[in-house]
Amino acid sequence: MAAEEEAAPLSGVGWAAGPESAPAGWSVITISVEGSAANLGKGFGHKGGYLCVSTAAPGSAGPVVTDVQVLSDRNPQPAGYSRAPEFPEPRSGVSRKKRLYVRLQPRGAAETAVFDIKLSGKSRAVPQYMKIGEIGSFAIWCKKGALPQCSPPPVPKPRTVSLGLKQLSLADSEQQAPGKPVAQSGSRHASFTLHNSADDGSSIYNLSAMDGVPFTLHPKFERSPKSDSSAILTDLTVKSLADIEKEYNYTFVVERTAAARLPPSIC
């Protein structure tokens, strides 16, 4: 038997008249721990009798077996328990000295469950199993353990946008409101438009590397409001075409000399 956290709990325990009598999905216990045939003998309305179990499907939310009891026919049926089913249905009027009762609970409400059942001789002890009774010449043992709860599928967390990103400008220049003032060229500190992107989560991907980065204009390129444009023009020197040709005259002597040289002779 695998470890409890890897094994599946039992979803049913019943009787089978023979190894071939159990329905689909049920497993018949045909061998005891000593290796002998686990035929519980007559007395159940059939020529023989075997215990059979069904296992809960992985991830199933159906009921699981939380306890099994073997009682005499003189004992009343315990509250919360049901008679173990028999395959095929027994004939009416057949007496049974021992009866098998099973308690089923929803998987979400159960903390422990039965994971396995084994049969052994009455004088044999099965480690890590609990004896629940005797039928015929066999002792019946069950293995209980903590029931691992089925965890719900993970739900992705909603994406949140920080307040700092919401305050950055995420809109293009053509999307700016017409009533908002445009930054003046003479201002030393550039301003950027505040845009609330709470309603537009996709616009965060339009953010460039320079959005929200302040910059300062060098004083050399600033224009004083009191300065006169005529004072700036007095520093300019106007040159004629002849002055420009004389100052930047280039005769290409080096290039012409290099082009006139004959290629070296090949010996």
Curated annotation (Swiss-Prot):
Where is the short sequence motif SH3-binding located?
154-159
Q: Which GO terms describe its biological process?
A: endosome to lysosome transport via multivesicular body sorting pathway; protein transport; receptor catabolic process; regulation of epidermal growth factor receptor signaling pathway; viral budding; virus maturation
What Gene Ontology cellular component terms go with this record? cytosol; ESCRT I complex; late endosome membrane
Q: How does it sit in the membrane?
A: Peripheral membrane protein
> What keywords are annotated for this sequence in UniProt?
Cytoplasm, Endosome, Membrane, Protein transport, SH3-binding, Transport
Give the UniProt subcellular location, in the record's own words: Cytoplasm; Endosome; Late endosome membrane
Q: Which PROSITE patterns match?
A: MABP, UMA
The UMA domain sits at 210-259
Which Pfam families does the UniProt record give? DUF2464
* Broad class of where this protein is predominantly found: cytoplasm
Q: Does the keyword Lipid biosynthesis apply?
A: no
| Self-association state and partner proteins as the record states | Component of the ESCRT-I complex (endosomal sorting complex required for transport I).
What PANTHER family does the database record attribute to this sequence?
A: MULTIVESICULAR BODY SUBUNIT 12A (PTHR31612:SF2)
> What is the protein's known function?
Component of the ESCRT-I complex, a regulator of vesicular trafficking process. Required for the sorting of endocytic ubiquitinated cargos into multivesicular bodies.
Question: Can you name this protein?
Answer: Multivesicular body subunit 12A
